[in-house]
């Protein structure tokens, strides 16, 4: 084999950025070069042939670490395959003439894949390609470029601009062109609620959430110059993306609550934060379930980086399984024990992953949970991590069917993390269904910056479950509060009876994770009638309390809930916590075109500046200030 080795000089801008990202994760130079240079192959084409040749050649050199072998031999093997392809192309030209003819490149509707119900999802692509039946120039045109990511070589201000800037042509953009911009994204409808009278509804109850998916989806729509879909904006998830100065406690969860004046209004704001106890990571049993169907072509690079981010956070002795699904599910490996040698195995096995076909996600879920159960760790972290755009076009694919499937899997005490990727055919409602009903959490990632903020920095907070079925309730004192409005949580609202019913499921909490809620309050004036709850029957005894916040939760392996409460008695200053949550709510309401949004742009800019000027909240959020500023400007 040749001594001509891949080097950093061989990497393009995107690959160099990826190389730096993998270095940050702690991988070796050869591993970083291999990971940065290789992109999951499509089922056809020269790149697929190169990978097959690479894997075959390495079998003769098994003692050489795969990444070292890849770095040292990729150039030569790739050149051999390309030379052979060029030779075949010239032979075809002599026999038949150019495939291009005078019409140029022509895209046409792909033939239906056998056993795939194409009536449910129309797929467009080029005709099947390989180096034996298509010219290299056409193949290059058809390759899906990885989605852009935001590297550390740029200033924070430039990164913030790039986060929301239209991306260059990639797979998602090509899909738009091929379908005349057809939009098949789907979201659950959100019905905004107004003020509730305390005398009519003295309690406000909701399922808590630590999800952040909505802000990832919002950023991706802006990045692709899409009109924002109001139902894609879940205010609670915008708030949860940011970090708050909330102390943990010895309890599994801790309640933080404060009331302050609402700017330019007679009303007050109630800020509620629930923080999970920070625990050391336990032994991990992780099953990575990757959607490798054709719709994931433009997400292949960020999916690979997310996978290797998870691997980098696993410790020696942890267990990893890798399952992919498209037309069918494929077990790449299972029960692999993590050690310094297994990283090379993982990288080599990654090259077997092929992006093609339809999406039978239900079969993949069945297989993933089977292996999670096979390697179940008592008192450990047992988790399925699903990466997908949610475009399930055969197998079980209705929301009701998926809910039934995942509720059954919930009984295994294996927890779920859903990582959404992509645009155009993104099925947010399906991913919400899986996460909400499967002891799961849900985030959306489309570039390296989001990956670092959501997975790398918050790994314990999305992987290590410390409580499940976590619900919150606020009971208001009618002597103090006339009416209230909960900002967000429209589709997570529950009744007072459901709050107390342990059979009513909710979402989990992970180590150090935070759930934030905000209420707008109209204050009471004069005497109120008795309606029979704590404050209504004991108004005089509780006259100094504005409300009581209650949280119910279950330990991961238990089915009986525990209850904690906190009374709120004092109106305080407009804290940085409250300012940050308030601005997030205002931005969300502006994107939703809410009739309740009344925060002037100049005040929003001021509060953003004040929140991040100094103090703990500024320190916790760092670069996120730039994103908040960019979002605030984008809705103008």
Q: Where are the model-predicted features located?
A:
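Hydrophobic residues positioned within well-ordered beta-strands of beta-sheet architectures
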Residues: 206, 255, 270, 286, ...
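Amphipathic alpha-helical segments in structured regions that serve as interaction surfaces
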Residues: 7-43, 47-58, 66-69, 73
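Short helix C-cap/helix-to-loop transition motifs enriched in small/turn-promoting residues
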Residues: 45, 62, 228-231, 247-252, ...
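Exposed acidic/Ser/Thr-rich ligand/metal-binding surfaces
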Residues: 104, 134, 152, 253-469, ...
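Low-complexity, Pro/Ser/Thr
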Residues: 1-2, 68, 72, 78, ...
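Acidic/polar low-complexity segments with low predicted structural confidence
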Residues: 143, 184-268
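Polar, glycine-rich mid-to-C-terminal structural blocks
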Residues: 415, 441-446, 452-457, 463-510
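Long, acidic serine/threonine- and proline-rich intrinsically disordered regions
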Residues: 104-108, 122, 126, 135-146, ...
């Amino acid at each position: 084999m040749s001594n001509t080795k891949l080097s950093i000089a061989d990497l393009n801008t995107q690959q160099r950025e990826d190389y730096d990202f993998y270095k940050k994760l702690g991988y070796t130079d050869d591993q970083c070069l291999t990971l940065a240079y290789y992109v999951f192959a499509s089922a056809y084409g020269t790149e697929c042939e190169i990978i097959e040749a690479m894997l075959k050649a390495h079998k003769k050199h098994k003692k050489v670490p795969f990444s070292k072998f890849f770095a040292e031999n990729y150039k030569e093997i790739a050149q051999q395959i390309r030379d052979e392809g060029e030779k075949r192309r010239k032979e075809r030209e002599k026999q038949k003439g150019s495939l291009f003819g005078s019409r140029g490149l022509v895209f046409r509707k792909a033939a239906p894949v056998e056993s795939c119900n194409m009536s449910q999802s129309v797929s467009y692509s080029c005709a099947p390609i390989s180096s034996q039946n298509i010219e290299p120039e056409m193949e290059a045109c058809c390759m899906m470029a990885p989605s852009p990511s935001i590297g550390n070589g740029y200033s924070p201000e430039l990164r913030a601009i790039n986060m929301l800037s239209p991306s260059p042509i990639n797979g998602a953009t090509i899909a738009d062109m091929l379908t005349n911009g057809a939009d098949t994204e789907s979201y659950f409808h959100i019905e905004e609620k107004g003020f509730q009278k305390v005398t009519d509804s003295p309690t406000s109850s909701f399922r808590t959430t630590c999800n952040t998916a909505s802000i990832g989806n919002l950023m991706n729509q802006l990045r692709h110059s899409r009109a924002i879909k109001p139902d894609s904006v879940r205010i609670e998830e915008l708030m949860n993306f940011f970090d708050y100065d909330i102390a943990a406690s010895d309890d599994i969860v801790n309640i933080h609550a404060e009331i302050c004046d609402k700017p330019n209004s007679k009303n007050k704001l109630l800020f509620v934060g629930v923080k999970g106890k920070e625990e050391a990571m336990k032994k991990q049993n992780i099953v990575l379930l990757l959607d490798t169907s054709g719709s994931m072509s433009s997400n292949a690079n960020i999916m690979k980086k997310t996978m290797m981010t998870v691997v980098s956070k696993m410790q020696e002795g942890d267990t990893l399984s890798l399952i992919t699904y498209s037309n069918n599910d494929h077990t790449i490996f299972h029960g692999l024990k993590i050690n310094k040698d297994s990283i090379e195995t993982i990288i080599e096995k990654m090259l077997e992953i092929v992006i093609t076909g339809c999406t039978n996600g239900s079969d993949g879920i069945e297989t993933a949970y089977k292996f999670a159960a096979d390697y179940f760790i008592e008192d450990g972290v047992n988790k399925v991590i699903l990466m997908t755009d949610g475009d399930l076009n055969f197998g079980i694919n209705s929301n009701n069917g998926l809910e039934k499937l995942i509720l059954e899997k919930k009984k295994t005490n294996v927890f779920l993390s859903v990582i959404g990727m992509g645009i155009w055919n993104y099925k947010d409602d399906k991913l919400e269904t899986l996460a909400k009903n499967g002891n799961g959490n849900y985030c959306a990632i489309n570039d390296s910056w989001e990956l670092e903020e959501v997975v790398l920095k918050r790994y314990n907070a999305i992987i290590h479950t410390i409580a499940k079925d976590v619900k919150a309730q606020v009971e208001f004192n009618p002597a103090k509060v006339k009416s209230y409005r909960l900002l967000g949580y429209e589709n997570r609202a529950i009744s007072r009876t459901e709050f107390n019913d342990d059979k009513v499921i909710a979402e989990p909490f992970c180590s150090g994770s935070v759930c934030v809620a905000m209420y707008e309050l109209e204050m009471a004036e004069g005497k109120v009638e008795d309606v029979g709850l704590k404050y209504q029957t004991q108004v005089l005894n509780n006259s100094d309390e504005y409300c009581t916040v209650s949280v119910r939760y279950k330990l991961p392996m238990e089915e009986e809930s525990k209850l904690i409460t906190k009374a709120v008695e004092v109106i305080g200053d407009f804290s940085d916590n409250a300012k940050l949550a308030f601005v997030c709510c205002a931005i969300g309401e502006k994107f939703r075109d809410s009739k309740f949004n009344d925060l002037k742009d100049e005040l929003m800019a001021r509060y953003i500046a004040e929140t991040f000027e100094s103090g703990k909240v500024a320190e916790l959020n760092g670069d996120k200030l730039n994103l908040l500023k960019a979002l605030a400007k984008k809705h103008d």
